Amino acid sequence: MRYIKFFKELNNKNVNLVGGKNASIGEMFQELVPIGIKVPDGFAITSEAYWYLLEQGGAKQKIIELLENVDATEIDVLKIRSKQIRELIFGTPFPSDLRDEIFQAYEILSQQYHMKEADVAVRSSATAEDLPDASFAGQQDTYLNIKGKTELIHYIKSCLASLFTDRAISYRASRGFDHLKVALSVGVQKMVRADKGSAGVMFSIDTETGFKDAVFITSAWGLGENVVGGTINPDEFYVFKPTLEQNKRPIIKRQLGNKTQKMVYAPRGSEHPTRNIKTTKKEWQSFSLSDEDVLILAKYAIEIEKHYSKEAKQYRPMDIEWAKDGESGEIFIVQARPETVQSQKTKEENQVFEKFKFKNPNEKKEIILQGRAIGSKIGSGKVRIINDLEHMNSFKEGEILVTDNTDPDWEPCMKKASAVITNRGGRTCHAAIVAREIGVPAIVGVSGATDSLYTGMEITVSCAEGEEGYVYAGIYEHEIERVELSNMQETQTKIYINIGNPEKAFSFSQLPNHGVGLARMEMIILNQIKAHPLALVDLHHKKSVKEKNEIENLMAGYANPKDFFVKKIAEGIGMISAAFYPKPVIVRTSDFKSNEYMRMLGGSSYEPNEENPMLGYRGASRYYSESYNEAFSWECEALALVREEMGLTNMKVMIPFLRTIEEGKKVLEILRKNNLESGKNGLEIYIMCELPVNVILADDFLSLFDGFSIGSNDLTQLTLGVDRDSELVSHVFDERNEAMLKMFKKAIEACKRHNKYCGICGQAPSDYPEVTEFLVKEGITSISLNPDSVIPTWNAVAKLEKELKDHGLTAR
């Protein structure tokens, strides 16, 4: 056949003939199907067929005339011309020989699947599409559940006409592509019955930070167009590549999306071949993929990335669409293309750490809305609410675009925006992809944004605070901090990072560092669990109906309270451990005080009213108590899961507020019973050296544990007898006090005597350079800092160590 190529005949060398999408499907069919990756079969109608059609009746010349002198920024003119061109293509009849070839290929495909008329997807594939430096994805149309020759011909024509939508013309103009040098091929691919299963998008790289060692997967019930189009908020998963390849099960994040609707087949004879129906409560409260499915997809992503990188002779992260057949249970890859944002950063750009931050971070700001952050920038301006494309011409440069959901035709408008906010969508929808590519901060999945905001309202959009994006009332000034990482000198003293928010882990791992000196368990409990641990242990007792319902809503997607608690904690710790792997990550077990626990959901039923909670029921004393022991065992199970199931053996454990040697023995026994034993698979167990008794009896504590991490905050409070929360005596609280320096010195010396680890993770080194200098000279193993202190402290330590070396001195 002259104008038809079956997928098995194609590979990536055929881009000019069948476009990037079809060439890539052919490549996978030839190279990846043999190693077990499933790809639905089909055929491509070549770009030669496109030119053949345009030669009929002089259509090509008419298109040239209609595009002459069109300014892509003149939205009204662009809309008129693009509509005229599409109508022209629709009105041009298929030559009979081309139509006959299409029908013959369709018959062969139907017979292959033992069907009279196969249900197929009809997809556009532009000859300049899916190249590493351009994201044509979604600019031309895709049609699902097409069945029969009449429908097939109609939707192939629809695909060809979609080469001239407003956005497609605008994009080509902005990238310097000649409109008549970009052709369109059409792919016809057997449908996967995802209408009875699930579908989505995955990337072999983190789309926000460029972290290379994670596969990011989005998923929803039904056909995948809702995920791609951003009309629902999908489930999200992260899988860590290095330990997955060691046959571990490193699902380091699961996030349940609301998935309010799903796309299914429409009855034959309907106006459209697919339709959306509401999901059931069970569906939106359940993950649309099992853990096994997530791991299969991640393995597919790794193999696809390896193949395309090998072929390109350079690292090539991939953007992949997948579908799970609800009838057979099989998972298929339906498209794969190079990722177009993170992969395009130059080596020089990757050597610069760029951080957007508010000029006055302590200024009080009113959060009015929040959703999923896209990118890491900040934008501010006046709101412009646009509910449909007809009003796009009212949008002014620098305004903030607020709409229900952006589809590919919105790009001319998005390019003018200082930020974008949508009611719906996830991190892999077209709006998110385009926002990343043009460098505009966007927040998607902001329920009710178009109702809560109004045109002309002044707001600030921040995507610089982690995975969650915030909309603030008013305009707040921001600045950009840029640091050249290539100039950083190595240090002998290890520089670690303190981290409490797993969502920032991938970003913070790009700072110069030797690992994590303090990962705060309690921050994960506070932000992910939200309920008192004992309220979960004891879910069916002592609960009001309201409280019980709130807790059950938090647990949606998980089998039971224990499954929820253990997996959520493991995911948070796993995310941090993966981000810094294989560098050490020291996790401090939970260290809430009773008044802090009391404020959590259900907490008032379990906590005493203490006069001085700072010195009360906290730390190790809580772990072995009869009332809290089971909750701590769950915590231990989560830590063991990170090391054993996820394979993240770089994670170490640290016990806070340990008062006596006897307490130490009790806690170690609980850890041992929960598969956390010092020395097993390289595990080290430290304690926070934050009580004077830890220093006074350092030799005894170090005979039980593998090292100290000095907690300068509590150690200063308890050595100087100062309530660190009291303003009346705050002037006395000073880690530079001579007594404190002696405490630090004694702790370091004790660790050296026992040849054990000694670090510091309190606030002192972040605040006082002279304390850092003292610790370096005393020979401390590591200094763990708040992220904003890492670079200046690193440079100061490198300079100090060089000066010591130049004078023939070394740390003690």
Swiss-Prot record:
Job description of the protein: Catalyzes the phosphorylation of pyruvate to phosphoenolpyruvate.
GO molecular function: ATP binding; metal ion binding; pyruvate, water dikinase activity
Family: Belongs to the PEP-utilizing enzyme family.
Pfam families reported for this sequence: PEP-utilizers, PEP-utilizers_C, PPDK_N
Catalytic activity: pyruvate + ATP + H2O = phosphoenolpyruvate + AMP + phosphate + 2 H(+)
This protein's name: Phosphoenolpyruvate synthase
PROSITE patterns: PEP_ENZYMES_2 (PS00742), PEP_ENZYMES_PHOS_SITE (PS00370)
Gene3D superfamilies per the UniProt record, alphabetical: ATP-grasp fold, A domain, ATP-grasp fold, B domain, Phosphoenolpyruvate-binding domains, Phosphohistidine domain
Swiss-Prot/TrEMBL cofactor(s): Mg(2+)
Active site, UniProt feature: H430, C761
